[in-house]
Structure formats: structure tokens, C-alpha cells
């Protein structure tokens, strides 16, 4: 779902004259990092957050480090539905390798002295391509549970409050 929505969002933004820098598959903190690192004026991220499969939305923000509040999203919805937006010719640029830039930044700034064993349960969600690498990079011994990306979420929803996920973690601990 996310890929199709991402394409539509990019088409919509570029049709209003925006310059879109696509950093690829990411987590919310990575998007905020990218806004500062790439000196971007705004962010838009397609995310399901911790919703059930099929429930995807868009997180947006203009001020660095802040996302739109419900009132701002309502205003944006009205602008879109009433076609009260400007038209222009924007463009898109793929930022290759940004996942590695993000991981290296976190690893270089966060080393630990004491050995820590970390159980990482990602529910086959996006965190699985980040968390194990970052934690190993800072010096943790990582025990991975369901870290392979699989958008069908075969065992449980990747939500830290999901009881199946919590049970998997407690068994590993």
C-alpha cells in the first residue's frame, strides 16, 4: 500500500511545484534527521505507524522537527479537495544510500562500553532493516525476532503494544 501512496504523494507535490527528495524506505526519526541533514523545507512520509495492514496514511510537517497537527491536516485536506492549490512544475530526486548515512550517524555518535544483549522484535516491519544494524554497530549483542521485512506481517502487527509481539519478546528474554 505504501509504495502506491508514496507515488501519488510525489506526483501531487511535484504538480504544485515542489522539489521532492526521496530518501526511500525509512522510519520517522530518519525522516526528521533527513529534514535537517538535507536542509529540506518540509517533510512528507507515507506511514502505517502501528496500524493494521492496509491502513496507511501520510505524516507531514513544515517546521523542522514538527509534524502537522490535526487542524493543519484538516486545512490541507480542504485545500486539496477544493482544488485551492497552486500548480507548477516540480521535480523529484532519489537520494541513494540515505539509510546508510542515517545508520552511520547514529552508530558514530552512540558507542557503549558495557556489553548489552538486546532482544529486537520488529514484527517483520521497517524497523527490522535498521534496529539490528544500529544496535550491533554501537556494541550490542542482538537477538533478532522477526526482523526480516515482510509486509504481510505473518506473525503479528509490528506494534510494540501487540500482545503476540510482547509474548515473543518475553520468550526470548
Task: Name the predicted role of every residue range.
Residues 56-173:
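Gly/Ser/Thr-enriched, mixed-charge loops and adjacent short helices
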Residues 1-55, 134-173:
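N-terminal small/polar loop signature for handling phosphorylated ligands or for N-terminal nucleophile
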Amino acid at each position: 500500500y505504501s509504495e502506491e501512496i508514496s507515488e501519488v504523494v510525489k506526483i501531487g507535490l511535484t504538480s504544485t511545484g515542489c522539489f521532492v527528495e526521496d530518501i526511500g524506505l525509512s522510519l520517522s526519526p530518519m525522516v526528521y534527521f533527513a529534514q535537517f541533514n538535507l536542509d529540506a523545507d518540509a517533510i512528507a512520509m507515507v506511514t502505517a505507524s502501528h496500524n493494521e495492514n492496509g491502513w496507511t496514511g501520510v505524516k507531514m510537517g513544515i517546521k523542522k522537527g514538527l509534524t502537522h497537527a490535526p487542524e493543519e491536516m484538516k486545512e490541507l485536506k480542504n485545500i486539496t479537495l477544493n482544488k485551492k492549490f497552486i500548480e507548477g512544475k516540480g521535480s523529484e530526486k532519489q537520494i541513494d544510500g540515505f539509510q546508510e548515512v542515517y545508520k552511520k550517524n547514529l552508530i558514530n555518535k552512540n558507542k557503549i562500553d558495557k556489553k548489552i544483549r538486546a532482544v529486537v522484535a520488529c514484527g517483520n516491519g521497517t524497523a527490522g532493516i535498521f534496529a539490528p544494524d544500529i544496535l550491533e554497530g554501537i556494541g550490542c549483542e542482538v537477538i533478532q525476532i522477526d526482523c526480516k521485512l515482510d509486509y504481510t506481517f505473518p506473525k503479528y502487527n509490528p506494534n510494540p503494544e501487540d500482545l503476540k509481539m510482547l509474548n515473543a519478546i518475553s520468550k526470548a528474554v
